[in-house]
């Protein structure tokens, strides 16, 4: 039985800023250059799917495969690692372009900056990315996971040297716990991929980190003869990836925008409901959300 796809035109209020400067081409080039400085870096593939294109009756279909990213099977590490670099740059009075991997891991930087403890909440990939980056950069990480998280996910994070636990809390309460502990810890920092009032700078840096993936994809499309895609599809998640992808490509193709489609599951459709209603809110607890151990999915806040 075919399942119907629900869709809505985005009715959220528009801003005067149509290009989202934080995702500007020069800003994202800094993120890309930073990630390229890691010895483990390589571009992930953009795969052409000719049979899918033929089946759908369109000219071309491409998929960006992030399963190869830094050996972590997910794009999330791009955001956490760049946010750490931006934070260290801010604390040391430098531009992030002055802090490639070789400098961040140097004895001189250790003397100048020392160590911070980066706190986060996760149901998997974001926390693993934060733990991986902290481990590589000589920093500390504390990761809280919500009730119902699998031991495999916990072990993957523990292998990266982080302090990690599974709390008897839902995802949102784990975020609150991480933020509280970061505030109470000397040199504690909350690195979360969702934003709230008063906490927007680090999520913006995380979005810029995701821009590396988008920049790669734009270059790979061009190399395969596609100057501009007609449509770009991206999963909603908690909103930061969607905001990053739309923001970057809105700058790259500013004179002729593609159609952007943000996709999410019907059981956790808060962005869809927000777009249809024209205002932000919270989606009710759904079956898919329960499976993913998240009490509710928040609307895009950045």
Positions of PLM-derived features:
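PLP-dependent amino-acid enzyme catalytic core
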Residues: 1-302
């Amino acid at each position: 039985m075919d399942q119907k796809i629900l869709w809505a035109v985005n009715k959220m209020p528009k801003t005067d800023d149509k290009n989202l400067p934080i995702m500007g081409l020069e800003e994202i080039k800094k993120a890309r250059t930073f990630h390229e400085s890691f010895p483990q870096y390589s571009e992930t593939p953009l795969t052409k799917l000719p049979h899918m294109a033929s089946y759908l009756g369109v000219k071309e279909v491409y998929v960006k495969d992030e399963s190869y990213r830094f050996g972590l099977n997910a794009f999330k590490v791009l955001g956490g690692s760049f946010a750490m670099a931006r934070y260290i740059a801010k604390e040391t009075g430098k531009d992030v372009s002055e802090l490639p991997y070789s400098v961040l891991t140097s004895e001189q930087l250790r003397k100048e900056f020392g160590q911070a403890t980066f706190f986060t909440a996760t149901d998997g990939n974001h926390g693993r990315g934060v733990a991986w980056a902290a481990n590589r950069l000589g920093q500390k990480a504390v990761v809280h996971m919500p009730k119902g998280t699998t031991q495999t996910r916990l072990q993957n994070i523990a292998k990266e040297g982080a302090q990690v636990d599974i709390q008897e809390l839902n995802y949102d309460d784990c975020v609150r716990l991480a933020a509280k502990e970061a505030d109470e810890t000397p040199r504690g920092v909350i690195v979360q991929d969702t934003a709230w009032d008063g906490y927007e700078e680090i999520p913006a840096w995380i979005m810029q980190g995701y821009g590396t993936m988008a920049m790669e994809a734009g270059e790979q499309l061009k190399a395969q003869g596609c100057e501009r895609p007609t449509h770009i599809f991206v999963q909603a998640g908690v909103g930061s990836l969607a905001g990053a992808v739309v923001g970057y490509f809105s700058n790259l193709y500013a004179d002729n925008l593609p159609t952007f489609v943000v996709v999410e599951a019907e059981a956790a459709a808060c962005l869809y409901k927000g777009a249809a209603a024209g205002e932000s809110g919270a989606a009710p607890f759904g079956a898919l959300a329960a499976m993913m151990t998240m009490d509710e999915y928040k609307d895009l806040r950045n």
